[in-house]
Amino acid sequence: VKWPNDLVLGGRKLGGILVEGRMQHALLQRLVVGVGINLVAPPVDVPHAVSWSEWETPPTADRVRRALVDRLVLGLRTVLELPSPDLWGFVSQRYTKILWGLGAPQELSGRTSPEKKHTVLLVGPTEDGRMRVLRDGVPDVLHQGEWVWSYP
């Protein structure tokens, strides 16, 4: 996973994850999870995209869908059984293990100033889902949507 939600294969974007939740009185009321995977062809408007078929014969969309739902249900059952104080530690530890590019230099630009490039070193996620980095050698915290990430 490339922060915050890209699925990466061979250093290129294979798909993405979108999670939206609704809280009420500090409790999660609703959660919607969307996953998109380029099985056969990458989108033409994403130059750094890749499709599963470029690596091997992809499974059918139904098979992928069933596997994703099975894993998601298993993961949600595990997480929902945890006491609230332990939840972030559990999720963050697993997210950090699969985070692409952690500890390696990454190039990004501001969404409002794409011509200005920065080199960051990914340090790890914060408790609220932002990313701790060293940006041009200075500690910083990045917010989702403010930055555009380069691909190699």
Question: Where do the protein language model's features map onto the residues?
Answer:
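General beta-strand structural signal in soluble alpha/beta enzymes
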Residues: 1-3
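Long, positively charged amphipathic alpha-helical accessory segments at protein N-termini or as interdomain linkers
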Residues: 9-152
